Amino acid sequence: LIVSLLLFLISCSKKEEDSSSTSSTVTCASSRTLTASTKVPLLVVRVQYANATFQSSQTTWADKMFGTSDGQLNHYLDETTYGKYQFTPATETSGCTNDGVVTVSMAENHPDTQGNSWACYAATAITAADSSVNFSAYDTDSNGKLSVAELQVIFLVAGGESAQSINSPGGVWGQAGSLTCDVNGDGGIVDEPCGSTPDNCHGVTLDSVRMLGMTSSTYGQNGFSQFGERQGNSPIDTWDATIGVMAHELGHAYFDLPDLYDTSAIGAGIGYFG
């Protein structure tokens, strides 16, 4: 009788463990039907650090970036481009396979670059993401480079969005640009070792393709965009970044749109509309 009771209790305990394990299973984003005439591949690289980890799940961000419901990026693009453009998830094997989001964890603390360049850290992050993505598959014209149209890459960095003065435990400034990294730390990039081709001064080579470098016709790479995870009114009153900053930076990165607000500090841009 005692043995039977013990076996019963062990069985109950095992069922509770199984139940707990099941309840903690990650729920992946459901498949979506995109209706735009042009579907642009987009890879979202979530980057977290030893002292700055994400407060929302990978699926939360996959929904926000690729979802088609009100308040999600593809819904906004569908409306504003009159059904011409949407972003489709890049093929990857991280976490929820093929939801377009790869999460990488850095061993060091957040670099807290704020308004300074985060490009060298972007190079490290995209290299860490390489094991989950076959970048060569996006080189559709087989020229050894990824262009703006072939693949967009946006980095979502755990911590704050410095453009809103949220820098705890570290912040980056939302922006779009190209990966030009001051490897030798002298404050400039023009004297970086380029080897036999200027292309080596910017971008990175992964899976035998050059990427994230300058987007001009001379170089023809895809650049990248970035933003901080948390926006807010103060360091103690924050929330996940809304789609405004994502749409804005991807507007620069893919559509090559200008800023409509004043960037010279001597004018008013186009006023309140911008």
Feature map (PLM): residue ranges:
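Bacterial N-terminal signal peptides
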Residues: 1-8
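Bacterial Sec-dependent N-terminal signal peptides
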Residues: 9-28
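Metalloprotease/metallohydrolase-associated module, dominated by Zn2+-dependent proteases
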Residues: 272-274
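Active-site-proximal segment of zinc-dependent metalloprotease catalytic domains
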Residues: 25-269
